Amino acid sequence: DYSIFGSQNLLEWEHLSDLKLPRTTECPDLFPLPVDGDENDIRWVFWAANTSYYVGSFDGRTFVPEQEIKMLQPESPRFAGGSAYAAQTWSDIPAEDGRRIQISWMRQSTPGMPFGQLMTIPQTLQLANKDNGVFLSAAPVVELEKLRQETWQSEGIELGPGSKVEAGLGGELLDIEVEIELGNASAVGI
């Protein structure tokens, strides 16, 4: 269970409302986002530690969910392969920027290393209208593109069984973006 409190002076607090979010009890976040970038269609997202969230309305006192609870694609490689936890968003980004940026703690076991966790790369959050409701999506912040040094791009490559495409690039870190149409294939490896 979560509670929303308000204060005029940050010393005296008033209980405003309660909200139930199943299977999680920590690291809440509550923030507005436009749906499909439309500033006339603002919804609020109530977020919890395990990447579960509600989309709804907030009148300054009470959050009202408009649809069932969702998860931000917990097994998606775009969201740390299901290892992301306890995400929080920045609230002081200039309004003219227009983004809601989030960073998460990531559970990671790295044998032989002196650390066991890390922070995910910052992600830009957006709300999008789909056939069965409004969904939250996350994508790496555009500032990461400034870190790229060498790039390789190709289009229209047709692959068959055992085919290989070599870019001639190497390094310790690679940022790979791929769009694949499976055609008759059941799997493709990278």
Where are these regions (language model features)?
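Surface loop/turn motifs at the tips and blade-to-blade linkers of beta-strand repeat domains
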Residues: 18-22, 79-80
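Hydrophobic core segments of beta-strands in well-ordered, beta-rich domains
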Residues: 1-5, 15-20, 28-31, 39-50, ...
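Structural signature of eukaryotic scaffold interfaces centered on beta-propeller domains
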Residues: 27-40, 83-96
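Beta-rich accessory regions
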Residues: 59-74, 78-85, 91-190
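Short, solvent-exposed loop/turn segments at the edges of secondary structure
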Residues: 23-25, 49-51, 82-84, 120
